[in-house]
């Protein structure tokens, strides 16, 4: 029977997730199974028994610690997965309460639930969720969490209640998780799969000293039983918790109406990786507590709250092989070849593994079932192996000793480097084609007609010997290629377009020329800084390491890489060829533009209507300012457009003046005296 098989499968995964802290499928795959079971029971209500996995909260408590009853049940949350389902939930709520409600929008932390009980302000018990009625006592371990006070603070406006039961989420910050994994892999142990499971296992250590070393954190997000105080709203409850010294999220917002809720959901869907911990959705709650009581709850979840789950960014798949790629600077990078799997709306079959040390740190073997993540446009990443799924047939990856493209012996550039490189920079076929393709990239010369296949064809046909020959290409040499030649032997339309693109690219600004040279560590930010400081390729070439390092935004590592690059004869030959072909090597300062931002550091975050990202940076640089990438106390202004990231919040925290786009335009035209700090409304 389908229901029986599905229920047993869900129960097994619940056991692995909640009790063993060792799941073998992703959260998204589990959600899909549970949803299928719920839909089956919706069609056949007689199947919905009290012990069905759809009716239980969590997977039951583990037996390692003393069972303890919660004062009030710890309910779970129902989930929605798209805006239509969210609107349908809100419609059901507002049919009962009336329209135009205030909702609280909270980030949904991907952690483990914890219940704290305070009597007369002192912590007396901490317990895991368990089955919602009975959990396990982890008081000693909870006391090691920095965010959990042993005694509540006097609340001023909010007197400390006689009895307080508060719920929250225990989690690991991503940086702490990475540090923990690095440490245990160095000891020869397999890495942990993800922060959530690691937090759960850390909370249930028998030795509290082990828990203390794990650097767990906590955010409070709800109340159980409370005596001596009744909050009028969820928002007020959070103010009270904060006054008592309990941690609450700084990302919670109170909004009116479901449209505003959907805006918050969309915002955090785009910015979920701007937070120090993992989130997997938004929790939306009716704010007014009297309405919460009216709406009530089902056997497992409140009707006044819902979890909007973002599309899964993690999945499990089979690691078929580990191969290596040679990049434009000679770096040899292992990458994973996997059975294709759909994540975040796209099919993923390959992911970088960075270097041999990273393969070892992650503990992955060829043949493993692995967990992979793809966050929006971010390159897919292998998180680690599902150790419980191993069969014994897996094998270790061995890094090659010679370049797979040219056969040159591989070696680290200097002792202690994690990366190994092919030293045959000048003629290694892989490095050549990657450099030619890089010249055409959007951050360099932005040559639309020169794609990856074109780069390969130009080199293989002999039309060019290296990137130095690009700007001297003519019709005769293009006719030696297959890609740019028609069947009748004439130049194709794409060939003509390539020649036009190359001619136009000769007049690109100096910073783009610098990026196109493939100097290690020199991306658009450093290139802009060098071009603004020195103004010509000749002056950059002649500058000392100290002079280069003194450039704001460059520093010693980039300076050394630039100076070293210009000591190589064939590198200088590329510059000479480009110069001879008419590529502009000097930035002529437009004297008509006033230096209104001389010495000021400006950060732009979010999308502006009248400026592209590069356009905003160039406008700042042209006026003598620095287009910085991060906010600090030295930042003069932060310009905030649509959908700003964490930089806006950082500016608020540091008291840095915030401008909208209109203020930015005035700042460019008239300087800092003409603008006042403008803080956009948060939603």
Swiss-Prot record:
The active site is at residue 108. Its EC number is 6.5.1.2. Zn(2+) binds at residues 403, 406, 422, 428. SUPFAM superfamilies: BRCT domain (SSF52113), DNA ligase/mRNA capping enzyme, catalytic domain (SSF56091), Nucleic acid-binding proteins (SSF50249), RuvA domain 2-like (SSF47781). GO terms for biological process: DNA repair; DNA replication. Keywords: DNA damage, DNA repair, DNA replication, Ligase, Magnesium, Manganese, Metal-binding, NAD, Zinc. One of its GO terms (cellular component) is cytosol. One of its GO terms (molecular function) is DNA ligase (NAD+) activity. The keyword Transmembrane does not apply. Belongs to the NAD-dependent DNA ligase family. LigA subfamily. Residues 592-681 form the BRCT domain. NAD(+) binds at residues 27-31, 76-77, 106, 129, 169, 285, 309. PROSITE patterns: BRCT (PS50172), DNA_LIGASE_N1 (PS01055), DNA_LIGASE_N2 (PS01056). This is DNA ligase 2. It catalyses: NAD(+) + (deoxyribonucleotide)n-3'-hydroxyl + 5'-phospho-(deoxyribonucleotide)m = (deoxyribonucleotide)n+m + AMP + beta-nicotinamide D-nucleotide. InterPro entries: BRCT_dom, BRCT_dom_sf, DisA/LigA_HHH, DNA_ligase, DNA_ligase_AS, DNA_ligase_CS, DNAligase_adenylation, DNAligase_N. Its cofactor is Mg(2+); Mn(2+).
